[in-house]
């Protein structure tokens, strides 16, 4: 059981806040937290039950990661780099992730599922994430339990499928089987009834039809209507591979973006993951409808595909950064987004540090309708990520935002507070046995890796 929040004062050598609607960096200020809210930001030391007064911290709003996959990332880790697992199809979604995640969840005990969930949440918190949206198969409800137990602000997004058994054959053609839509929506509703709003609203749900090629028209319409009825975010993978685009064209004579628009799904409430195979016309359509793109550059770079943050922004789309299924490293994604954007645009002025920081703070909060997140100001939720800027690779320091994007890494995360609770200090989770969690999670993943079908998938 986590302790209740207490009055806390944290000193920042630099504090990222706002002035007249824009980012502002304050020098040598204190952030005072009372309960679950920020009470004040002041240059003078306030009274508090807990005082964190060490200099050399850069205080940021708690970082927001709107697209992450704990389980599939661990499944693929060190097995799918350098082209492994994708010889018969460019996307490991259909060769590794979908078949092995389903097989693994059928195989696991509840304890093993919880071990995997805890390991993922631990990595996220230690990496500076305060809020995470996590699409996952509904056979892993332990993601909710692990987030609640370890203090993460969590938007669980259990998948809905019309065809849950999409898998690429030896010829590279994806074949779709199953009809799980009604059952998945019922399971989503059950999870919503159990978890929505737990711990003062820290645990929430998002609707998550898996992708345009695995969800038929009826399911997409029904899921979207349900999300709008409940006022929860709606997220889906869109045009994440050439195969998906070809499938939707063959079925419906449309692109994935046009398909969603035809169904009434494309709108300001839609969080569209990846979109790497969207045309310029598709992106213009999405911008007109007000959709948000969830950009995850490193997972596509691993496959030799460009996913440029600046490209989506140039089409007028609100674009935020997520980790997807690669390394759960949000700071690493910011640097990758900067490098990939600048090199593909042949311009040093795109994807600036302030823009990228907004993509994991203010813009991400706006995408889910949370004006109390992604900002350090009185009245906002007490979610804080602090970077230790005293390391040799961060000194001397002139502009802390540029240092965060270009020089820092997740090992520099010093403090993470969520909902007024100090969870991470000195880079370690205060309420978790990190060694035990790591060992148990690794053992559970190893159980899947040992399966003959897993070894064949990784070699394919």
Indicate where each model-derived feature is located.
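Alpha-helical scaffold segments that flank or form the walls of functional sites
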Residues: 77-152, 184-200, 442-447
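Metal-coordinating catalytic core of metallo-dependent amide/deamination hydrolases
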Residues: 145-275
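Active-site gating loops and adjacent loop-to-helix segments of metal-dependent hydrolytic enzymes
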Residues: 74-113, 158-179, 242-267, 292, ...
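C-terminal cap of metal-dependent C-N hydrolases
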Residues: 19, 381-438
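His/Asp/Glu-enriched, well-ordered alpha-helical/loop segment
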Residues: 262-269, 310-391, 407-409
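Acidic, glycine-enriched loop/beta-strand segments at the rims
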Residues: 15-28, 41, 303-305, 365-404
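N-terminal metal-binding scaffold of metallo-dependent hydrolase/deaminase domains
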Residues: 1-46, 57-59
